[in-house]
Amino acid sequence: MSDGYSSRFRKFHLFVILAVVFTTVYVGYRHGPLIVSIGEERFSSRDESSASLGHEFLPKNFTLPDDVLTDPNAPAFANSSRMYLVDIRRLFEIGQTIEVIIELFDGYGKRRTIGGDDVRVRLYNDDLKAYASGHVIDNGNGSYTARLVALWEGKSRIDVTLYHTSEAIKAMYRIREQSVGYIIGKFKAGDVEEDTHCHPLARILKGRELCNLTLENGGMSWYCWKPSSIKLLCHDWTEVTYRSSSHGLLLTNAEKGLLSPGGYGISIPGNVEVEVKNSSNIYMNVPECANVNSAITWNQQSPIGYYYNNVWKPLHCKGFTNLAKIQKCLKGKKLVIFGDSTTRQWFQSLEPFLKCRLVSESWSTTKWHKPAKALCEHFDFSMEWFPNALPFNVGKRWESRRYLRPVSAYLEEIGHNENIIVVVHMYVHFIAYHPDVFWDRIQRIARSVRHLLQRNPHVKIFMKGTHTFLSFDGDYFNSVFDNMSHQAFKGLHDKVVFLKIRDFTDAKKTFDIHPPFEDVKEMVKYMFSYLC
């Protein structure tokens, strides 16, 4: 071989090696290797740094120490704690602030000296069907200052609830470094099939080789144990189901008590009643919600509104007026709703409210996880609902993975001239996972929203915030996820409306993860207020 030819061959050989290395690094960065060896602790770059993200979104005065709770009497006890009014007269006028001091005590009757507990407050009158949430300030020393607003005449009561102690919150974070739930993936080729564990974080799935199915999940991180059968490949993944997993979680008995029914969501005793006089309505001169800069909706302090006679009344703007006005406003438009079963409730409530008819596949189950579409021919309007991508809890039955596409993928497909309204929501299906998973997804959605607004500046976009509930312990993460959404959508606040739904459920102290349909209707009407 001549020296010239040898030199050219070496250069070509070096070029091929560099090309392969670059391609491997690039693909690894974008999607990770198809098979990841957990035994050798090789993760995608996204997973290596994800263990501490999310903590920055915790409230002020909150820390996450390494120690675990072993003494069941050390946390705050609602029944041992107390609350009292700053103004002992208990008489207020419409619009005045009602201030309450809350002092927490532990199971030994000793005053708490640290903060970090999840304390919520509301004002209510069941006879008037009037309810409003309040704003709670953590003083960092075991005491909390709650501020409510006098919004209706008559006598009302104050309810202060210790939803989660700081020790419970620390435990909830710690077990999400493991996993409190798994998606099971089915791999199938011909008559051979196998079920394996799946998770959005590779570090959770230890002990076996993994299939990196991020690309198949629309670019959202997704991993499953590689099937043991040599007849099954990673691309044979077809279906998913869900399994809860409390086995092996690193919880002490004291922590288990805090995360079990009866260990959270307990009202602090106190017969605190106030009376409000003066029927003047100080909120009469507020603008129409449709004329309000959407940036305001991202920075509102509770309460943003209140229920009166079970009708929601926003405070900073005039809300829903009448159905005819809404129908006129929606004429020729399409509403696209993304999310979970709570936005599916929105879709369900809108069908009779707007007199639409379902034109997609009839729902054979109440837990419907396929896209749905309805038409309102009488005023040229259509609406669609799409479930989120994985992680998505489809329940105990098997569902095809092809129906679970990322919101960002749908947003990228919306045309430049479509007359469209978009509602985006993520929440409950992410509670079982470390907050990093939500953070990754919401950033991707925000990027796609930016692209959409550049392409179609006339599109109307809503971000439906989280809600609160008492039916299980995970609702603490509502504030963390809302903070993440706020951060991810920075620079878009004046173009996207944030719907602070937790004020609706805090006001009513909603128990179930699915709010009652009478409240869902009020949420939908509130959204419409910003359209017309």
Describe the predicted segments one by one.
Residues 2-139, 145, 149-532:
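A compositional signature for long Ser/Thr(±Pro)-rich, low-complexity
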